[in-house]
Every structure is written in C-alpha cells, then in structure tokens.
Amino acid sequence: MLMRTDPFREFDRITRELTAPGTWSRPTAMPMDACREGDTYVVSFDLPGVDPEAIEIDIERNMLTVKAERGPAGNAEHVRMEVAERPLGVFSRQLVLADTLDTEQVRADYDAGVLTLRIPIAERAKRRRVKVGQGESHRQITG
C-alpha cells in the first residue's frame, strides 16, 4: 500500500470532488500552445496517457474541435486505487480558425503525449506581389 504524507490530503480530496472529471456534455479544457512557423500555424495540446484512438478532431466551417478521453488504467473491476491524482474523463478545446487558413490541409500527429496540429495558411492569403504597368499596360498579380 502507498502512504501519502501530504498534510493537505483532505483539501486534495475535496478539490477532486468539486472538479469532477470531464464528461462528453461537460468536458474539461486541455492545455495548449500555438505559434506560427513560416506559413504554418502549429497548435500543440497536452494529452498524456490518452490513446490516439480516443482523440477526435473535427473542423466545421472555421471551428476546430479537439476532444479526447482518458479512462482509468487497467481493468477497473480488479483494481483498487490507492492514489488517483491524474485527471480522467473527457477533455475538449475549440478554436476559431481564420478564413485565411487552409482547413483542407490540416495535419495531426500524436507523440509522447502531445497532439500537434499543423494548419497551413491558404494560398489565397499568402503575400503576393502586384506588378505595376505603365500607360496601357495592365496590373498583374503573381504568386
């Protein structure tokens, strides 16, 4: 048996009861980072211990939704938890994507408990040079 020597054990128990695990109707938020690398936005979500098959990524119009579920380890009917500090349940995060992003080309990778999405900037939104002509010449946009 594992012994806890934390003097705030009762506070921990009360906090866990008040912040119950997320459910599909009321999921818990997951931590994330977002940055831009050249012409791609990179969004990383911390999902340690989540089976990749339990991760759902949906894009509807410009709304990106990530949902994941982490259940208890092992066979629950034969396991008696002594210490349960890792969060369980459903985790979710929604992001509103700009119209300038190419939602058809989103890539998702899951490695070492981190889900990484790569969202490229749409070609139509990339910087272009406008050629200026003189007199009867016309202006032409080039990529």
Curated annotation (Swiss-Prot):
Coiled coil: none annotated. It holds the Pfam family HSP20. Residues 23-135 form the sHSP domain. Signal peptide: none annotated. It comes from the Bacteria. CDD domains: ACD_sHsps-like (cd06464). Keywords: Stress response. Induction: By heat shock. PANTHER family: HEAT-SHOCK PROTEIN 20 FAMILY MEMBER (PTHR11527). Belongs to the small heat shock protein (HSP20) family. This is 18 kDa heat shock protein.
